[in-house]
Regions:
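Amphipathic, Lys/Arg-enriched alpha-helical "gate/interface" segment within cytosolic domains
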Residues: 1-140
Length: 140
């Protein structure tokens, strides 16, 4: 049986891009965190950014929260400067993400966008350019 979650992670220049889907358990969050750190490792010597598409993410159990919080701490301690989260307005999704990911600190800022093009444009305006300006080439 296929897992109830899925994700894709890849790099474009100094931006780590992810698509997350499904309902997440602690194990799925751990799988994501491990793969995320491996993909981000080449970027950590300089400032980098992250963008994630989460319209198809169906939230996670409360046990994912410490896993994601630790990942966020690792990212910020390893030069992550900006994070763009892309999803249609959803108060429950926003509530869970706000519990796991800080919005702003010295040297870090997270923003939420309802449209992917605006998220990519925000990162580009900060000097974090990607080859693509949407997720469609990796969807499916």
């Amino acid at each position: 049986m296929a897992p109830a979650y899925d994700f894709k992670i890849w790099r474009e220049n100094n931006v780590l891009i992810a698509i997350i889907c499904g309902s997440w358990s602690k194990l799925s969050a751990q799988d994501f965190a491990n793969e995320f750190k491996q993909a981000a490792a080449p970027l950590t010597g300089q400032p980098w950014a992250h963008i994630v598409y989460m319209d198809d993410w169906n939230l996670g159990v409360p046990e994912i929260e410490p896993v994601v919080q630790e990942l966020v701490t690792w990212c910020i301690n390893n030069n992550l400067r900006y994070a763009a989260q892309v999803h249609c307005p959803n108060m429950v999704k926003r509530y869970q993400m706000d519990r796991m990911v800080i919005e702003k600190s010295d040297g870090f800022e997270r923003r939420i966008f309802p449209e992917q093009q605006a998220a990519f444009a925000w990162l580009a305006s900060l000097g974090f350019h990607t080859k693509h300006t949407n997720f469609s080439h990796q969807a499916g």
